Design a protein with these regions (language model features):
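Conserved alpha/beta enzyme-core scaffold
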Residues: 1-172
Length: 172
């Protein structure tokens, strides 16, 4: 028996204010909450920070232009992205070069651990990954620590105001 949704995509999108930080699930737009993203596009919600593995796709599987969260980037509704991979969305690089989009790239495991650290209430994560790379220049890097002769980067937790996950079917 079909139940009425607890919340429609439009109602969910209206809960997200300008300037919010949103964590988005999925990989190459699979698993992203595309219905809510479409509603955010309609509402024109702006100055968003997106945290995701990637920034969606420049072209969708049915030929759609700017698939998933890439549509928010295309519409200049995003001011900052925190991701592990942005290569499938060339507009990210273009807007970053133009100075209209801040891009913070983190290794995939580091991003996952920094998200986990926030959820666990930890003050940070030590990782040997990213030493002497642009990761060390990230706003999430608090510096190096040496423990038992080995160097680590101390990374801040990554926090979001909202998390959007795509689902075909879910419970309350």
């Amino acid at each position: 028996m079909a139940k009425k949704p607890v919340l429609t995509a439009a109602e969910a999108a209206k809960m997200i204010p300008d300037g919010a930080t949103i964590m988005c699930g999925g990989f190459l737009a699979c698993g992203q909450a595309r219905a809510i993203v479409k509603e955010l596009v309609k509402l024109g919600t702006k100055d968003l920070t997106l945290i995701a593995n990637d920034m969606g796709r420049a072209v969708g599987p049915m030929g759609e232009e700017f698939f998933g969260i890439a549509e928010l980037i295309h519409n200049h509704q995003v001011k900052r992205v925190i991701a592990t991979h942005v290569g499938m969305t060339p507009e990210v690089g273009q807007q970053n070069t133009e100075g209209t989009l801040e891009v913070c790239l983190l290794p995939q495991g580091t991003l996952a651990e920094c998200i986990r650290a926030d959820g666990a209430g930890l003050g940070g994560v030590l990782t040997p990954v990213g030493i002497d790379t642009l990761v060390e220049e990230s706003p999430f890097c608090l510096g190096r620590q040496t423990i038992d002769g080995k160097d680590y980067l101390l990374m801040k937790p990554v926090h979001a105001d909202f998390a959007l996950l795509g689902a075909y079917k879910c419970d309350e």
